[in-house]
């Protein structure tokens, strides 16, 4: 049984200019005291073609964590544009929030991110070299992809099989036909994971 349940993730400052920090308000609950820290990460997928372009925007240790409900705002700087392939700068990518305990990842929340120019002229005639200062980042906050993993929470070395789901296939995730058209923009009326995904995020 999982000792930590993520109850809610709220995407803050969305949409925003590309260079603005990512901000997520995370609410989670521990069913008992944790003797070691939780490690949270924000990872930006620079390209679906290769993991070498993934950027860990920030990593923070939270703990020791007592039993009960906790909330914090996780903020991370924007990705380094110099590490993003020019062909992948504009369009749809993914940002991931992960949490590990004793080096074991037990939850991953992925959001589609659409980077596009706000000026009509630039959208119709984009520059060969991306101008990141003109890009707007829009996170599809109402449709996260949640993946949970069984881990060993106890003070022993017993290995547990991953029984919930495997790591998300990012190329598949990015090629989904369900994505809204970038030209139409995305609705930002819902910026919260909230308990609408409770059936997918219940405690293991």
From Swiss-Prot:
Single GO molecular function: chromatin binding
Residue numbers spanned by region Required for interaction with HIRA: 155-204
Localization per Swiss-Prot or TrEMBL: Nucleus
Motif (Required for interaction with HIRA): 31-37
Entry comment on modification after translation: Phosphorylated by TLK1 and TLK2. Highly phosphorylated in S-phase and at lower levels in M-phase. TLK2-mediated phosphorylation at Ser-192 prevents proteasome-dependent degradation.
Pfam families hit by this protein: ASF1_hist_chap
Listed SUPFAM superfamilies: ASF1-like
GO cellular component entries: chromatin; nucleoplasm; nucleus; protein-containing complex; site of double-strand break
Keyword rRNA-binding on entry: no
Chain segments carrying region Interaction with histone H3, CHAF1B, and HIRA: 1-156
Signal peptide positions on this chain: none
Main localisation: nucleus
Sorted UniProt keywords: Chaperone, Chromatin regulator, Nucleus, Phosphoprotein, Transcription, Transcription regulation
Family statement: Belongs to the ASF1 family.
Subunit structure: Interacts with histone H3 (via C-terminus), including histone H3.1, H3.2 and H3.3, and histone H4; the interaction with H3 is direct. Probably interacts with the heterodimeric form of H3-H4 taking the place of the second dimer. Interacts with the CHAF1A, CHAF1B and RBBP4 subunits of the CAF-1 complex. Interacts with CABIN1, HAT1, HIRA, NASP, TAF1 and UBN1. Found in a soluble complex with NASP and histones H3 and H4; the interaction with NASP is probably indirect and mediated by H3-H4. Interacts with CDAN1. Found in a cytosolic complex with IPO4 and histones H3 and H4. Interacts with CREBBP.
Protein name: Histone chaperone ASF1A
Species this protein is from: Bos taurus (Bovine)
Taxonomic path: Eukaryota, Metazoa, Chordata, Craniata, Vertebrata
């Amino acid at each position: 049984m999982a000792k930590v349940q993520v109850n809610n993730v709220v995407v803050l400052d969305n949409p925003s200019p590309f260079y603005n920090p990512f901000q997520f308000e995370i609410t989670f609950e521990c069913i008992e005291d944790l003797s070691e820290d939780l490690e949270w990460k924000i990872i930006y997928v620079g390209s679906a073609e290769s993991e070498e372009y993934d950027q860990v925007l920030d990593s923070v240790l939270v703990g020791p964590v007592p039993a009960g409900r906790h909330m914090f705002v996780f903020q991370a700087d924007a990705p380094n544009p110099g590490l993003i392939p020019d062909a992948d700068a504009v369009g749809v990518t993914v940002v991931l929030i992960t949490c590990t305990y004793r080096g074991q990842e037990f939850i991953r929340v992925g959001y589609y991110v659409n980077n596009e120019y706000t000026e009509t002229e630039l959208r119709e005639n984009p520059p060969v070299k991306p101008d990141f200062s003109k890009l707007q980042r829009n996170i599809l906050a109402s449709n996260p992809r949640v993946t949970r993993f069984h881990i060993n929470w106890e003070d022993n070395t017993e290995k547990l099989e991953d029984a919930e789901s495997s790591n998300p296939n990012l190329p598949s995730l990015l090629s989904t036909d369900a994505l809204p058209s970038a030209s139409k923009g995305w609705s930002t009326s819902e910026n919260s994971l909230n308990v609408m995904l409770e059936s997918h995020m219940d405690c293991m």
